[in-house]
Swiss-Prot record:
Record text on subunit structure and interactions: Heterodimer of an alpha subunit and a beta subunit. PSII is composed of 1 copy each of membrane proteins PsbA, PsbB, PsbC, PsbD, PsbE, PsbF, PsbH, PsbI, PsbJ, PsbK, PsbL, PsbM, PsbT, PsbX, PsbY, PsbZ, Psb30/Ycf12, at least 3 peripheral proteins of the oxygen-evolving complex and a large number of cofactors. It forms dimeric complexes.
GO cellular component assignments: photosystem II reaction center; plastid membrane; thylakoid membrane
SUPFAM superfamilies hit by this protein: Cytochrome b559 subunits
Cofactor(s) annotated in UniProt: heme b
UniProt-recorded name of the protein: Cytochrome b559 subunit beta
Main localization, broad class: plastid
Organism: Cuscuta gronovii (Common dodder)
Pfam families: Cytochrom_B559 (PF00283)
Family as reported in the entry's similarity comment: Belongs to the PsbE/PsbF family.
Entry function: This b-type cytochrome is tightly associated with the reaction center of photosystem II (PSII). PSII is a light-driven water:plastoquinone oxidoreductase that uses light energy to abstract electrons from H(2)O, generating O(2) and a proton gradient subsequently used for ATP formation. It consists of a core antenna complex that captures photons, and an electron transfer chain that converts photonic excitation into a charge separation.
Name of the gene: psbF
Alphabetical GO biological process terms: photosynthetic electron transport chain
The organism's taxonomic lineage, starting at the top: Eukaryota, Viridiplantae, Streptophyta, Embryophyta, Tracheophyta
Domain of life (superkingdom): Eukaryota
Cofactor note: With its partner (PsbE) binds heme. PSII binds additional chlorophylls, carotenoids and specific lipids.
Binding site for heme: H18
Amino acid sequence: MTIDRTYPIFTVRWLAVHGLAIPTVFFLGSISAMQFIQR
């Protein structure tokens, strides 16, 4: 595999990972905050 033209796959993968990880962290943080506020 050449080092040329691996950037689209890398970019799509990076965007997919961060696009899923950031809302997941925000979602877990909001859930923990709601449970902490309810008690």
